[in-house]
Amino acid sequence: MTTARAPHSAVRIDQANARGDAALIAYLPVGFPTVEASVRAGKALADAGVDAIELGFPYSDPGMDGPTIQRATVAALERGTHIEDLFHAVDELTAHGVATMVMTYWNPVEWWGVERFAADFAGVGGSGLITPDLPPEEGAQWEAAADANGLERVYLSAPSSPARRLA
């Protein structure tokens, strides 16, 4: 692992806003078509000027993803993409200077261990985690681990979410 890291994605978004621009955030499924190819694609996107990259971690039951991401997820899992590959990709991309977030279902984080995941992810320079299936009401353990490791946490909401839930 290297020591030079990209700033967090929130910093990059703030920098874009200060320029009067919208932040450009690219999405890549890690491990598709291969882990190294996804890393090369991420570096190319960084070189082309994206403000941040969101890496999608493949999950065996990607019910909240669309068909294209589902197909990429299946292909990545069939090729053996594992959580260590995610940390490798984040390490490579943050060392290349790009702020890197991860989108993952909650089950892989629990399987790895919440505190261990947060520490390992922060150790390779990750910015934060987007957890589409972890409601904020159930996120206390993740919030504590993320805060302890300086990670951003992003919950998703539906258009029908009441204002009190978004506060």
Task: Give the location of each predicted region.
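N-terminal amphipathic alpha-helix/helix-capping segment at the start of soluble metabolic enzymes
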Residues: 1-27, 90-92
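Active-site beta->alpha loop and helix N-cap motifs at the rims of alpha/beta catalytic domains
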Residues: 4-7, 41, 46, 52, ...
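N-terminal positively charged helical leader segments and presequences
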Residues: 10, 14-17, 35, 43-48
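N-terminal glycine-rich anion-binding loops that anchor highly charged ligand groups
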Residues: 16-23, 48-63
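Active-site mouth loops of central-metabolism enzymes
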Residues: 24-40, 100-113, 153-160
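Mobile beta-alpha loop/short-helix "lid" or hinge segments that flank ligand
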Residues: 59-62, 107, 140
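Catalytic beta/alpha-barrel core
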Residues: 77-81, 125-138, 151-162, 166-167
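Distinct, well-ordered alpha-helical segments
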Residues: 111-117, 140-145, 166
